[in-house]
């Protein structure tokens, strides 16, 4: 039997806007976050529909973990179609609330439809968009992000990190409209593997995109192997930059030490983390950096860049080490330190396990449910 909603006692009809669904080959941490939350809301008795972009071989409609997914055009047509598709959806099958998931191009739903709206914000791109997509798309994204404070003057928002909240406030969103709720973790799946020493395997996880800066990890591996000759690197993920990264590996003569796995199922990712001596995240910006917490839960400390999102998920010196962004030498030094200093490593592993135990998808779902009720109750009041 489905659980009843915890906050209002009434089942809500929810429409979610997010470019990708969980089956999209480009799905990442944002999509995991969306489905972990909304599948729980479905279990509590709510109905959830997601309007997402299509991709090669995708069915126009499907149901994933109880969430009904309707796919529109491809990623390039999707944002132009959303205003019309949303209005048609609401006209034929009304909803109690629309949830904008803000991590790519903003939807600006309050200007599109007269319906209660709230938002889940992973991160906004700002100028990092110019290092991920073509200039015209990046410019349009940056300009559209400037409209968010005007469209969402009184929209209840859930930010997944203090860094994201600070970015929203700096852009003009009222602090009282934002609650910070970090992602959760499946503690039943993410756990340490067999005890014993781990080989010096370094794992890097993420989409192979420019702003993720996997090239910095590859360059650092050259220095790391001078101190730890048997250090190896597994790069997990897919993306447009793979060819460029593979060429860099060849130029640095690291073919025998670097593995590109492509996209792999979650169970295999967990196996890598349970074997890893170290996780590295070199991204220029993250909403939170959930892979860091997943690694902590599997007994792998991390070295990450000191940037928004990652400085929220890493407790420097307690669960991992933070280094300056794109600093190859600093990354190499920190990685060698974790790989060779056993007392430090033991302290980071213990701190990481304790830290990871604090993250709960149920709490994140509770907060989302409360935000939805707030959006419905406050609709029509105007800015506060």
Question: Model-derived features: where do they sit?
Answer:
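Conserved donor-binding/catalytic core segment of Leloir-type glycosyltransferases
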Residues: 158, 194-221, 234
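Carbohydrate-associated surface elements
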Residues: 163, 184
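A short, well-ordered alpha-helix in the C-terminal region of glycosyltransferases
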Residues: 337, 344-358, 367-370
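Nucleotide-activated donor-binding/catalytic signature segment of Leloir-type glycosyltransferases, i.e.
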Residues: 246-264
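Short hydrophobic beta-strand element within catalytic cores of glycosyltransferases
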Residues: 292, 301-304, 314
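Conserved acidic donor-binding segment of nucleotide-sugar-dependent glycosyltransferases
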Residues: 316-317, 321-328, 337-342
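Aromatic "clamp/platform" in nucleotide-sugar-dependent glycosyltransferases that forms part
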Residues: 284
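Membrane-proximal helix-turn-helix segments that form the acceptor-binding/catalytic region
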Residues: 136-157
């Amino acid at each position: 039997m489905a659980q009843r909603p915890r906050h209002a006692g009434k089942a809500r009809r929810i429409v979610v806007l997010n470019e990708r669904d969980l089956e999209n080959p480009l799905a990442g941490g944002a999509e995991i976050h969306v489905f972990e939350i909304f599948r729980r809301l479905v279990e509590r008795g709510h109905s959830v529909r997601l309007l997402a972009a299509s991709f090669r071989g995708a069915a126009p409609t499907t149901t994933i973990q109880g969430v009904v997914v309707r796919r529109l055009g491809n990623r390039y047509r999707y944002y132009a179609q959303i205003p019309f598709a949303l209005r048609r959806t609401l006209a034929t099958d009304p909803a109690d609330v629309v949830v904008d998931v803000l991590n790519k191009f903003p939807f600006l739903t309050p200007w599109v439809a007269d319906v209660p709206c709230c938002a889940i914000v992973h991160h906004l791109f700002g100028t990092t968009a110019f290092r991920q997509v073509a200039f015209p798309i990046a410019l349009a994204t940056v300009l559209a992000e400037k409209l968010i404070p005007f469209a969402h003057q009184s929209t209840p928002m859930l930010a997944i990190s203090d860094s994201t909240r600070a970015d929203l406030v700096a852009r003009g969103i009222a602090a009282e409209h934002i609650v910070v709720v970090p992602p959760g973790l499946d503690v039943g799946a993410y756990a340490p593997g067999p005890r014993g020493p781990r080989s010096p395997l370094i794992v890097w996880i993420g989409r192979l995109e420019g702003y993720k800066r996997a090239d910095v990890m590859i360059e650092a591996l050259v220095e790391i192997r001078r101190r730890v000759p048997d250090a190896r690197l597994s790069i997990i993920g897919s993306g447009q930059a793979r060819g460029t990264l593979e060429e860099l590996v060849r130029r640095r003569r690291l073919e025998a030490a670097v593995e590109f796995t492509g996209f792999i199922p979650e169970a295999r990712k967990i196996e890598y983390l349970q074997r890893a001596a170290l996780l590295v995240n070199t991204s220029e910006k993250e909403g939170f950096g959930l892979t860091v917490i997943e690694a902590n839960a599997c007994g792998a400390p991390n070295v990450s860049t000191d940037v928004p999102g990652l400085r929220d998920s890493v407790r420097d010196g307690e669960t991992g080490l933070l280094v300056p962004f794109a600093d190859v030498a600093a990354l190499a030094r920190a990685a060698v330190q974790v790989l060779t200093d056993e007392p430090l490593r033991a302290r980071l592993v213990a701190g990481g396990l304790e830290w990871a135990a604090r993250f709960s998808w149920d709490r994140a779902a509770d907060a989302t449910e409360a935000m939805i009720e707030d959006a419905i109750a406050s609709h029509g009041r105007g800015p506060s």
